[in-house]
Swiss-Prot record:
Family: Belongs to the FAD-dependent glycerol-3-phosphate dehydrogenase family.
Protein name: Glycerol-3-phosphate dehydrogenase, mitochondrial
Pfam family, one: DAO_C
Sequence positions that bind FAD: 69-97
Designated gene of the protein: gut2
Source organism per UniProt: Schizosaccharomyces pombe (strain 972 / ATCC 24843)
Source taxon at top rank: Eukaryota
Catalysed reactions listed for this entry: a quinone + sn-glycerol 3-phosphate = dihydroxyacetone phosphate + a quinol
GO BP term (any one): glycerol-3-phosphate shuttle
Entry's Gene Ontology molecular function annotations: glycerol-3-phosphate dehydrogenase (quinone) activity
UniProt pathway: Polyol metabolism; glycerol degradation via glycerol kinase pathway; glycerone phosphate from sn-glycerol 3-phosphate (anaerobic route): step 1/1
Taxonomic classification: Eukaryota, Fungi, Dikarya, Ascomycota, Taphrinomycotina
Amino acid sequence: MFSIFKRRSVQAALAASGLVGGAVFYSDFIKRPAPSHFNPQFTPFTKSLAPPPSRETLLKNVEDISKFDVLIIGGGATGTGVAVDASTRGLNVCLLEKTDFASETSSKSTKMAHGGVRYLEKAVFQLSKAQLDLVIEALNERANMLRTAPHLCTVLPIMIPVYKWWQVPYFFVGCKIYDWVAGSKNLRASTIFSKETTVAIAPMLDDSNLKASCVYHDGSFNDTRMNTTLAVTAIDNGATVLNYMEVKKLLKSKDNKLEGVLAIDRETGKEYQIKATSVVNATGPFSDKILEMDADPQGEPPKTAQFPRMVVPSAGVHVVLPEYYCPPNIGILDPSTSDNRVMFFLPWQGKVIAGTTDKPLSSVPTNPTPSEDDIQLILKELQKYLVFPVDREDVLSAWCGIRPLVRDPSTVPPGTDPTTGETQGLVRSHFIFKSDTGLLTISGGKWTTYREMAEETVNELIKDHDFGKALKPCQTKKLILVGGENYYKNYSARLIHEYHIPLRLAKHLSHNYGSRAPLILELYSKTDFNKLPVTLADKEVFAPSSDASSDKSVSYASFDEPFTVAELKYSIKYEYTRTPTDFLARRTRLAFLDARQALQAVAGVTHVMKEEFGWDDATTDKLAQEARDYIGGMGVSSDRFDVKQFEVK
């Protein structure tokens, strides 16, 4: 009797959930007005545009400007976000990044603009307003990302396979609460799929005990493209933004107040003294490095390594797999892994991202690499859901990023090991810390909330400093980022019509460059060499041609990935690409999508860049080897790389 009652209760719950879901789906989706996209016939189509200031011009700014209003250390998501916010308010901004934009944590995310569905469960069961506030903040900022960078951010359905009947209403109600909390910012209504529909959508799933699936919606985006876009947007608004500029020392007055920094151009070795009214530490997991310099009376870095006091670091690993590991337009969420985490399996850039792990660290490494244990853990979790064997050889790439939780450093005694479980005062969101010297440190948070973090940071700067000028209010909620102007949903179709290029290339350019894609295709159309994939740029072959009689002509089938010489030249001219690694790992995502293909491309990319920059052989060899070393740490066994065949000709 009990089993019958229980089954009927579950069926009733499912029916009620279905009715609620159907009603909300109708009101939220069917009745929602269709978005107004640009009419391609009347939308400006930019085929030429003056490039932004050269690196040399930006370096001259550093020498000529006696004092900046704001100096930002760090060129990741937060730093470039602050640069955009401050420059659009009318402040004179300088940003310095030690290596390249998004070279660390900001390039190694799960690629989700998400509302924090993980925090929602805690908010409900712990009755935690703080957790609920995190969800509301993230949902608001998710909507802002989708609006301000429409070419880089898209809506992605997430499927939760359910293998126990009682979990169906549990997960569905949770998804509906997520919709309700989002309110007008909700992307699409959550819904339930039957077992049959679930398997039809995701035939790779093991359906032996499958009952149904729940689907909610979040955002997906390209993190390094977003980071580069923010840097270029800041420059477009008057900021001086420089990669490969390392801060070696903080400059202080006699009364121990910050006046600026001593920085070195890592390309030339030249030092610059840069003065500023205010200094922002936006170095993410490396925040403590700058705080240690700030604590020194001379602004020097410490001579011995210290435990981080503000950042509580943990390492998160992701792997990339072939596209058949996940449906092409819907992600999969494992809500409870063997170690009580959540794990995502997401379609991204034609591949599948799986992750992430969570391993506490006592220090913050530079460019960490994934361990084999972490890779195997992810594959083991994935195997629980799939009908076919998960093969280690299918791992195309893997990466390890540092996830910074933060705390008030003034509450942490020096020498406290962050792995000892001392979590008192730990902040689950971002945290702004003001030093007595005037240094403002912003750390923590996540990609989705970068804009709000930047707004709060600039608000604090304006509160604490007299910049001697009238300033605008925050502009970034409505500011369309570079490439988002005049972009519309079917932009790739216009690129195909205008330039007669393959669909895959058109989609790649429109989804990563938006309305600036025509600038790349103008370069593409200029010469046959510019049409080559970068993997073949150092070979004696011709560009794609209709002349089938040419035995050296490359067919479009040779484009394993849609990255061309034209895109490389554009990134050098418009996006401050300085090394082969910049292009292969951050301007494009080839190293993250397929490490083997990226290694094959090193020679071609280096060949083109040598011609563009006029490098000597020693510089060329050094930068090519740096790229190989970087790619070699991306989770693919070294014995599978034949490095010699990829050396620069």
